[in-house]
């Protein structure tokens, strides 16, 4: 009878040890795990090809205008716009004036 009690207590100890090892047991761990999940989702979205399609005019040089179809993705967390044109990804930082000057004509001339 005593050995059965020891066995049950041992199983209870194993279950409690498993719980404390693999599950968050305080608010900090829970917050960190939630932030890691959100960051993984953002990273996955940034790696995907954007789905918004625009027909726009691209200035290849000062006198030449070419029609093109671009794909846009906007990441509000880091303030970047990712543009895919002819299979190439271009990243524009919304906090950089040169990138904004490059991006505005593309967006204004798009349908």
UniProtKB/Swiss-Prot annotation:
GO CC annotation: membrane; viral envelope; virion membrane
GO terms, biological process: fusion of virus membrane with host plasma membrane; symbiont entry into host cell
Reported modifications of this chain: Unglycosylated because produced in viral factories instead of the classic ER -Golgi route.
Subcellular location per the Swiss-Prot or TrEMBL entry: Virion membrane
Topological region Virion surface: 22-111
Regions that span the bilayer: 1-21
One Pfam family cited in the UniProt record for this chain: Chordopox_G3
Induction and repression of expression: Expressed in the late phase of the viral replicative cycle.
Disulfide bonds: none
InterPro entries for this protein: Poxvirus_G3
Protein family per UniProt: Belongs to the orthopoxvirus OPG086 family.
Role summary: Component of the entry fusion complex (EFC), which consists of 11 proteins. During cell infection, this complex mediates entry of the virion core into the host cytoplasm by a two-step mechanism consisting of lipid mixing of the viral and cellular membranes and subsequent pore formation.
The protein's name in its UniProt record: Entry-fusion complex protein OPG086
Organism: Variola virus (isolate Human/India/Ind3/1967) (VARV)
């Amino acid at each position: 009878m005593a050995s059965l009690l020891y066995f049950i207590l041992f199983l209870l100890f194993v279950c409690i040890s498993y719980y404390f090892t693999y599950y968050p047991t305080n608010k900090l761990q829970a917050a960190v795990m939630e932030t890691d999940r959100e960051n993984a989702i953002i990273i996955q979205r940034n790696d995907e090809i954007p789905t918004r399609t625009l027909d726009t005019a691209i200035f290849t040089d000062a006198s030449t205008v070419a029609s093109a179809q671009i794909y846009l993705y906007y990441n509000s967390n880091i303030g970047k716009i990712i543009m895919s044109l002819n299979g190439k990804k271009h990243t524009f930082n919304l906090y950089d004036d040169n990138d904004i000057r490059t991006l505005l004509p593309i967006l204004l001339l798009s349908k």
